Amino acid sequence: MSTIAKDQTQINDKIRAKELRLIGQDGEQIGVKSKREALEMAERVDLDLVVVAPNAKPPVARIMDYGKFKFEQQKKEKEMKKKQKIINVKEIRLSPTIEEHDFQTKLKNGRKFLTKGDKCKVSIRFRGRAITHKEIGQRVLEKYADECKDIATVEQKPKMDGRQMFIMLAPTAEK
């Protein structure tokens, strides 16, 4: 959602429109009023006149306490930020001729990343003539994905990128 900058919010005398669709402090529709009439109504109840929908024809303004409105908006923004989850992509590098113990160590590290909620990019770099045996690398990647299938799903199947083959694993959604 876009945040409203302080200088972009039209309140009281900063309202540019001549006519406004007015909403009262309780949320009831008052109707289309001139800017002067709307300001007088807001001053009578000692509140502010705030444009809430500037793109509407005519713009929609509401009689409210602007300080309270701004505070509520900031509170909602903070709540939305809390709910956002930052997903990192961690990379595990393997070799097509990896030994079993090394494979298990790399697997343990990858599982740790996945349980934390991070995505995992498992890549194999082919050096020299090893590029002629891509199927060996593909088997290693498929074995890695198979070992992690209880906590992760394959987001991207094994794919070549230059001299590298990689697979993307994403943690399974918790229920």
From Swiss-Prot:
GO terms for biological process: ribosome disassembly. It is found in: Cytoplasm. Pfam families: IF3_C (PF00707), IF3_N (PF05198). The keyword Cytoplasm applies. InterPro entries: T_IF-3_C_sf, T_IF-3_N_sf, Translation_initiation_fac3_CS, Translation_initiation_fac_3, Translation_initiation_fac_3_C, Translation_initiation_fac_3_N. The keyword Lipid metabolism does not apply. IF-3 binds to the 30S ribosomal subunit and shifts the equilibrium between 70S ribosomes and their 50S and 30S subunits in favor of the free subunits, thus enhancing the availability of 30S subunits on which protein synthesis initiation begins. Belongs to the IF-3 family. NCBIfam families: infC. HAMAP family: IF_3 (MF_00080). This is Translation initiation factor IF-3. It comes from Staphylococcus aureus (strain Newman). The gene is infC.
